[in-house]
Every structure is written in structure tokens, then in C-alpha cells.
Amino acid sequence: MGARENVTRLLWTRSGARRIPPTRALDAALGRLAKGELFRICEFDPRGPLYLLPTRELVRALAARIRACGARRILEVAAGDGFLSAALRPALRGTRIVASDSGAWADPRARMTAGERREFRGVSVPGVRLGGCVLRFDALAAIRRMRPELVLVSWLPPGRLLERLIGAPVLYVLEIGAKGGVTPGAWSWRFAHEFCEEVERNARCRLDERPRLELHSRVTLYYGARHPEHARERVRPGDWLWQFRPRVTAGRSSVRPQR
């Protein structure tokens, strides 16, 4: 069996349903891929796209963190196919877990920059297909409708949506992101938060070509507007966080479809 086939068999069944592999097996398989091959699998395989690659250990660690918050009503926003919520339900019995997504990324061009649209013109790139149990609402509308205690979100694009979620009437926002500016960055740390290292250790994503050498996921628990410790730090020039403030880049729009 080739290295690529070994990875895809860990991620999907023969019928195309997604799998939850053990972390050790996935790490070993990823380590045998050629450089750049993981991105091609996650981006171009017609069963994708994939961003977060949930493992059994991640699901257990994430469920334990949510359970420690005492949250019983959980909403995953920008949920795509809803796979993460579906994986968590058996581990969080007695809680209500709902997944929602606006459907904005069903058209693959909606999740690309202008440069990516030029680069991949003529290339078959899958859009994000909503799962059968995923409600079609944008994130803030879903919060108004579902009134969750905890909002779960994975791989939001850079922008202000994460801040809007933190400012919504919820107790917690649990964000699974990635280093390197591909998801909201350290500027969001102005808001009161906790880092979830125990979850990060078990998180794998499309950037983890060599997970035994370097991991890229970042998992942060923010206190939402309903939490008694909700707060936002005022950041001034010279403060450490000031370097992460948003900057306007000429020639490239920072606007992404809301999910």
C-alpha cells in the first residue's frame, strides 16, 4: 500500500464516510507522505476538503474539556459537514450538540483568495458540503436561535467573526485554530481566555506533515459575554500583543464569507 493510500484509508471508509483514526497510526502514516502531499489530499480529494483531522484521542480530550466547563448546550458553528459534532456526541451523552453552517463555502471559490482562484483555475476543487444534520444558519443567527452555553468552532478564516462570537451571549467559545495566520491569531488573546494544551497535544490538521516533529494546532477557550470573567484587555503601542493587531494589506482583501 502506498503512503497516500495509507493516509486516505485512515481518513475515509471505502464508501467515503469519514473515519476517526488513532493518533499514533495517523502520525505514522503522515510521516511517510511526500512533502506537500497532505495539503493535496485535504484540498483536492473529492471527499474533502479537510482542515481539522480528528483522532480518537482528540475527541476524548475535547469532550473532557467541554465537560469540565459544565456546558450542556453546545453549538458548533462553521461546522461544514458536521463531522466534529457527530464525533463528540457519543462522548458527551446527556448534552445537546447542534451543528450549523451558513453554506457560504459550498462554492469552492468562496474560500479562496484571488491568487488561489487564478492558480487553481481549471482544477477540480471541492466545496464544503453541509452534513445532513447541519442546520443552515450563519454563526450569529444560530446562536440567537439555539442559545448555547458553549460555542465550538474549528478553523475559522482570519477576520472578526471570532471576536463577534466571544461578544455573543454565551458562556464559552472553544476555538480550534492553527498557527501561522491561517486562522484568527494572537490578537484575539485580548479577550479573557485559557489555553488548552491537553487538547492541542492530540489535535492534528492539514498543516501537520511531520507531526512527530512539529504540530500546528492551537486550542483556546474564551470567556463569552455571559461569563462573569469575560473581559477585553486594552492593548497600547509597545504592549506585546500590539504586534498582532490587524493590518490592511494593499492588493488583498481581508473580507471572507461569514460562516
Question: Where do the model's predicted regions map?
Answer:
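Conserved class I S-adenosyl-L-methionine
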Residues: 71-80
